[in-house]
Amino acid sequence: MFNKVVLVGNLTRDIEMRYAQSGSAIGASAIAVTRRFTANGEKREETCFIDISFYGRTAEVANQYLTKGSKVLIEGRLRFEQWSDQNGQNRSKHSIQVENMEMLGNSNAPQQGGNFGNNSFSNNNYSGNYENQSYDPYMSENQNFNKAKANPAPQRNQSPQHEEKLKEIDIDAYDSDDTNLPF
């Protein structure tokens, strides 16, 4: 099964860092994602708050450069977490395990921690295996996918006139309402 999530939003709190017994960094935070739309001629907003977790070097970079309110693009996978609370009640939630992130600078606001502009960072196939993690039935599938990504098929030489150029997307240009979307 395909499990990929891409979100752009702002952190709702600073990164909370922990370290596994193996020394691997684990970072936790949450992201607020706002959807703007028009309903019955009235402009409305709907904000969703999602817990996110970073692992390895990505956690360290996120902790160093991101603070509450930082705008970030994250790419990762959806996880379903289950536990028992102090009263013995079964609890659950969905969260995102971040695999790649891009720090998005906001030109309208001063940035804390230095001007990092638009920078991306990847876990470099870090699997997030740390102590007390339950069995992940998709891990072998993800490892095979990561091996395929690490060893891409050879590509033919193409002349520059046939290469597609990726255009940068101004995310803020799409924040007005759904009628401006290109699809």
UniProtKB/Swiss-Prot annotation:
Domain of life, per lineage: Bacteria
Ranges for region Disordered: 108-183
SUPFAM superfamilies: Nucleic acid-binding proteins
Pfam families according to UniProt: SSB
Residue spans of biased composition, Low complexity class: 111-135
Swiss-Prot/TrEMBL keywords: DNA-binding
Residue ranges, compositional bias (Acidic residues): 171-183
Cleaved signal peptide residues: none
GO molecular function: single-stranded DNA binding
NCBIfam families, A to Z: PRK08486.1, ssb
Name of the protein in question: Single-stranded DNA-binding protein
Naturally occurring in which organism (per UniProt): Campylobacter jejuni subsp. jejuni serotype O:2 (strain ATCC 700819 / NCTC 11168)
Gene: ssb
